[in-house]
Amino acid sequence: MAAKDVKFSSDARDRLLRGVDTLANAVKVTLGPKGRNVVIDKSFGAPRITKDGVSVAKEIELKDKFENMGAQMLREVASKSADVAGDGTTTATVLAQAIVREGSKAVAAGMNPMDLKRGIDLAVAAVVKDVKTRSRKIATNDEIAQVGTISANGDEEVGKIIARAMDKVGHEGVITVEEAKGLDTELDVVEGMQFDRGYLSPYFVTNAEKMVADLENPYILIHEKKLSGLQPLLPVLEAVVQSGRPLLIIAEDVEGEALATLVVNRLRGGLKVASVKAPGFGDRRKAMLEDIAILTGGQVISEDLGIKLETVTLDMLGTAKTVTITKDNTTIVDGAGVKADIDARCAQIRATIEDTTSDYDREKLQERLAKLSGGVAVIRVGGASEVEVKEKKDRVDDAMHATRAAVEEGIIAGGGVALLHAAKALDALSPANADQKVGIEIVRRALQAPVRQIAENAGVDGAVVAGKLLESSDADFGYNAQTGVYENLVKVGVIDPTKVVRTALQGAASVASLLITTEAMVAEIPEKKPALPAGGGMGDMDF
């Protein structure tokens, strides 16, 4: 076992703070409408230019092990925000840095770190409650477009395209973002279905960089039970190999010999195959498999219907134009099902929705209906160069997730103003002791950080802007960094999804309070490898 280096108390926290600052300073320059770009070197190909906070955070790895720990903890804040709300990564990073900085000062001054943490938790709960009460529901397409525009860093075209996509497939529909071949960004709506089951083995992946399995024009075997033995599968596998097309297997589970054989075939290139678990459970699983069968023009292979796996022929398999499988989701696009059958199935589900008394059942039936009828919207992002397309695609992705979050939990004033004004909710709190009160004050100061950073990125003094906004009693009054005007931000469409703001603060406080309570750090001491000995001379080489 390699020797370890151990750091304690202030020395440990100083190293952590240096790592936090390095990552946060690189990320926070991207915040706001006048945020700058960050150029990321790639080991192959052109450098990547991005304004997406989480993309910058993911690229940062520091040489010093202890500083790197701080940076990685902060990276976790950005990733969590991206996973839960799809946006707000830079805001979360700025908040976390502010809480860690203030918290470290308080700990150095002799405060109790655990009481500080309790104070921070109290304050965050109060702010989240305040933000939720001021949240308003989103109704019109224009509001959806505004959220998209803000999240795409002021790009109106992106906002409008996302609003159109959500209009076409409904709020429950699936929207994916791809790179276009040309200059223009366009919207395609394709009939399709997505369910929340990913590939059973990473060996099925066809695109290793994105960890995605893409199958073009595949056969789809829909099986109700577990597949563990190889023998029953052989006839259908041989038929598919002869056809030269890929195969997707959807079953309750694929394990043992069957899974091993599929993986070996995939790796050796004999058969392009992927398998996923069937979505849902119990009777709902049966119904969803029927949905997939109708959508793809196949049959559910079920013992109840008297169909054995050994007797399956190619005409019993479904087909689709493309199937995309990630670690969490499977999307079937352009299934070969008959439109009349799909419409009949949708009508049947609608009738069941009207009859059902359970809210849970109704919600699940609505999901199935959206998957069958909503289709998949594809936004193809265009640009003059590959670098530009990649940068724009990042922004479209952010904007799409932000609009989803806005539809889910509503909107509030943007530009960091919601958090700034939510600080007033902290006045009503009654902490148990003086150290907890300091924890609350740490959050109060941190809530100003996003507004200050947005202003500073726009070339204005952040402290002056924050001071002016705090004088106002109107919670929607803020600084529009795009135009440089103080105004009602909701009226001019500078809005943020409530979910994004809430997630950013909760994630930031969670990680930051853990960093403050750190008292010791352990890291491996890198081994110094001895230099190789010089090569000996070769005989008979003296000319």
Curated annotation (Swiss-Prot):
List UniProt keywords, sorted A-Z. Answer: ATP-binding, Chaperone, Cytoplasm, Isomerase, Nucleotide-binding
Oligomer and partners: Forms a cylinder of 14 subunits composed of two heptameric rings stacked back-to-back. Interacts with the co-chaperonin GroES.
- Origin organism is Rhodospirillum rubrum (strain ATCC 11170 / ATH 1.1.1 / DSM 467 / LMG 4362 / NCIMB 8255 / S1)
Q: What InterPro entries does this protein's entry cite? A: Chaperonin_Cpn60_CS, Cpn60/GroEL, Cpn60/GroEL/TCP-1, GroEL-like_apical_dom_sf, GROEL-like_equatorial_sf, TCP-1-like_intermed_sf
Gene3D superfamilies documented for this protein: GroEL (3.50.7.10), GroEL-like equatorial domain (1.10.560.10), TCP-1-like chaperonin intermediate domain (3.30.260.10)
- Which cysteine-cysteine pairs are annotated as disulfide bonds in the entry? none
Write out the similarity annotation.
Belongs to the chaperonin (HSP60) family.
Q: Which Pfam families match?
A: Cpn60_TCP1 (PF00118)
This protein's GO CC annotations: cytoplasm
Keyword rRNA processing assigned = no
Function as written in the Swiss-Prot or TrEMBL entry: Together with its co-chaperonin GroES, plays an essential role in assisting protein folding. The GroEL-GroES system forms a nano-cage that allows encapsulation of the non-native substrate proteins and provides a physical environment optimized to promote and accelerate protein folding.
As for subcellular location, the record says: Cytoplasm
Superkingdom of the source species: Bacteria
Which enzyme type, at the first EC level?
isomerase
Q: Where does ATP bind?
A: 30-33, 51, 87-91, 415, 496
- Reaction equations catalysed: ATP + H2O + a folded polypeptide = ADP + phosphate + an unfolded polypeptide
The terms under GO molecular function for this entry are: ATP binding; ATP-dependent protein folding chaperone; isomerase activity; unfolded protein binding
Q: Which GO terms describe its biological process?
A: protein refolding
**Name this polypeptide is given:** Chaperonin GroEL 1
